[in-house]
Amino acid sequence: MNGTDAEPMLDTEPVLRTDYLGLHLKSPLVAAASALGESLDNILRLEDAGAAAIVLPSIFEEQILLENAALENDLTRGTESFAESLDYFPGTPSLHHEMEHYLNLIRAAKNRCEIPILASLNGATPGGWVSFAQQIEQAGADALELNTYALATGFLKTSAIIEDGLVDLVHRVRQSVQLRLAVKLSPYFTSIPHLARQMDDAGADALVLFNRFYQPDFDIENLAVVPKLTLSRPEELLLRLHWVAILYGHLRAELAVTGGVHGVEDVLKSIMAGAQVVQLASALLRHGVGHIDTLHSGLLRWMREHEYASIRQMRGSLSRRSAPDPSAFERGNYIRTLSSYTLRYKNLQQY
């Protein structure tokens, strides 16, 4: 039996309970932000299927701004001729339909569900992050995930400017709400440990690794750039495991894995690397929400077979901090891996 925290064996069912963002969860299986959480009916289906918590789809500040701009255009079209018509319409600030729909979804989910409901926010301006975070808190969300999905396309914006901006927004939101905050990061930073420590210091309660950028494809026949969405693959998990294992034990913030978690082994590897929870999206879109129960049953079966009494017992057992050979996470292992692959290739040439 392996593990960093020795526990006496229990003659009972293995314990899947875990804590995340100050919430007591029945298991580490969390439904990630996706289209599955866009309606109350689907949210209830996810709860019935065994999700320990649900992250609602991200509300994007651009959605609200674009809607308001279109509404403003509709309300003012022709008013240079009929100025009195403005008296019949309320001002646009009260007509945030997208935001109000999102807040109503939070309220409805909290009213009907027994499991925690986490909101997800992707802002475009510092003021937008703060304002929307405050409204989300007032609506009753149990926690808030800051989805820092931003592409650096400007040639004058340095990596330091981008990272300082992200840290500043976390600090601003932290100062404005009492909600527990998770920050969803991308893997494309020069020094992930340094940024993680800065996020930790700024008040992030958890880091979610990693965001997936949805990259457009090229249509060579019509000379067009077209949107393309692909589900994650299990091999994408390796990058997440690597960084969670490195960060585990060095931050106050908790760690969550999202992207590439499809099977029971993926869940186990994530926890052994140091994650508190895993977030599931592509696996549920591919296999259906009933896949949560498949993973739940598989976890219990594996833990019984390997004599683990609880999830906590295995957490971090494969982290860099617990590894007898830390070089497995560093350059030395890269060299050994290449050498091993070269040797196998030479052996194949003999046939």
Regions found by a protein language model. Name each.
Residues L23-A32, Y88-T92, R180-A182:
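Short, basic, glycine/proline-bearing loop/turn elements
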Residues A33-G37:
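Glycine-rich phosphate/pyrophosphate-binding beta-alpha loops
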Residues D11-Y20, I59, V226, L280:
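Residue-level signal for pocket-adjacent positions within structured domains
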Residues L40-E61, L65-E80, H97-L118, N122-V257, ...:
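Alpha/beta enzyme core
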Residues T18, V30, I115, A253-A256, ...:
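Short glycine- and Lys/Arg-enriched binding-loop motifs that mark or flank ligand-binding interfaces
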Residues N2-V30, Y102-K110:
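N-terminal amphipathic alpha-helix/helix-capping segment at the start of soluble metabolic enzymes
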Residues M1-L10, S232-R252, V264-Y351:
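Alpha/beta catalytic cores of nucleotide-metabolism and tRNA/nucleoside-modifying enzymes
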Residues E84-P93, T230:
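Short glycine/proline- and acidic residue-enriched helix-loop micro-motifs
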